């Protein structure tokens, strides 16, 4: 049918955020619905924080299939849901809501999207591996928790705000079987840990457009071809951090893959169908190129 033929049987899902005008999700999901000939549509909703509770009630009242949730609602939405999956509870944020026969269930597909990107795009299995995480904000939390739930052996977290890094390490220790510890920002210990880690994840905004020359303090000289280096930034697609890692021979992955697979997972939670990943990837690349 395609998403343009709206009728009485059309299933509606969408995005709750404030703002939402910048989102790539509508183009990505609607292209996927068209590809699979599903009578579904994805609509962005600009939801003021004061109206969030009413908007969530609207998912049930309007019989929507579900929504994505973006800033500033990812934490605030949690009390209004009937159920949370374990990862969302540990991360402390929800980015996908599924209307399961009137029960609103909160998921976090950000971290799962990153891990699926690792396995699908970089052929990297976190089971039994070790990682360094730079940053301790929302995206960093999602990635760290999901890596731990996926069997990561050890994670070292460094962040300018030391307390946030310590809190994240503590949450991982309490909720998973992964060993987690904080390393002070810019500390020499980071270089020493490089010999034992397999994965480096840059999860700060440093290097994001337009400040493309910014880069976190990091012992690049310790990188080798054995390391996989990821930057969660996708604009620009090749950050200064990734370019410096490539110059050391390390394998690299940018943030587009995580953005793609968090959407893929949300699509599959709502529809029950296997997402057309290539179609979604192509649309996403075009959207990012357009800015």
UniProtKB/Swiss-Prot annotation:
GO function term, MF aspect, one: NADP binding
Top-level enzyme category: oxidoreductase
Pathway annotation from the record: Metabolic intermediate biosynthesis; chorismate biosynthesis; chorismate from D-erythrose 4-phosphate and phosphoenolpyruvate: step 4/7
Residue positions binding NADP(+): 135-139, 232, 255
Catalytically driven reaction(s): shikimate + NADP(+) = 3-dehydroshikimate + NADPH + H(+)
Family annotation (InterPro entries): Aminoacid_DH-like_N_sf, NAD(P)-bd_dom_sf, SDH_C, Shikimate_DH, Shikimate_DH-bd_N, Shikimate_DH_fam, Shikm_DH/Glu-tRNA_Rdtase
One record GO biological process: shikimate metabolic process
General function of this protein: Involved in the biosynthesis of the chorismate, which leads to the biosynthesis of aromatic amino acids. Catalyzes the reversible NADPH linked reduction of 3-dehydroshikimate (DHSA) to yield shikimate (SA).
Annotated PANTHER family: BIFUNCTIONAL 3-DEHYDROQUINATE DEHYDRATASE_SHIKIMATE DEHYDROGENASE, CHLOROPLASTIC, SHIKIMATE DEHYDROGENASE
UniProt protein name: Shikimate dehydrogenase (NADP(+))
Lineage: Bacteria, Bacillati, Bacillota, Clostridia, Eubacteriales
């Amino acid at each position: 049918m395609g998403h343009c033929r709206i009728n009485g049987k059309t299933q509606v899902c969408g995005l709750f955020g404030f703002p939402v005008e910048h989102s790539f999700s509508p183009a990505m999901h609607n292209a996927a619905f068209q590809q699979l000939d599903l009578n579904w549509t994805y609509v962005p909703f600009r939801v003021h924080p004061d109206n969030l509770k009413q908007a969530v009630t609207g998912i049930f009242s309007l019989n929507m299939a579900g929504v994505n949730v973006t800033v500033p609602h990812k934490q605030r939405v949690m009390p209004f849901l009937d159920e949370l999956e374990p990862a969302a509870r540990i991360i402390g944020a929800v980015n996908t809501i599924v209307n399961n026969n009137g029960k609103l269930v909160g998921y976090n597909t950000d971290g799962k999207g990153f891990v699926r990107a690792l396995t699908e795009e970089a052929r990297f299995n976190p089971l039994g591996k070790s990682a360094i995480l730079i940053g301790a904000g929302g995206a960093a939390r999602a990635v760290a928790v999901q890596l731990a739930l996926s069997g990561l052996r050890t994670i070292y977290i460094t962040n300018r705000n030391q307390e946030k890094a310590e809190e994240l390490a503590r949450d991982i220790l309490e909720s998973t079987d992964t060993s987690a510890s904080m390393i002070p920002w810019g500390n020499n210990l980071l270089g020493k840990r490089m010999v034992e880690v397999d994965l480096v994840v840059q999860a700060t905004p440093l290097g994001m457009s337009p400040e493309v020359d910014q880069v976190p303090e990091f012992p690049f000289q310790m990188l080798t071809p054995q390391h996989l280096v990821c930057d969660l930034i996708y604009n620009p697609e090749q950050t200064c951090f990734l370019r410096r890692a490539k110059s050391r021979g390390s394998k690299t992955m940018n943030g587009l893959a995580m953005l793609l697979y968090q959407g893929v997972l949300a699509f599959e939670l709502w529809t029950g169908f296997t997402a057309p990943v290539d179609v979604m990837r192509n649309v996403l690349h075009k959207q990012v190129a357009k800015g």
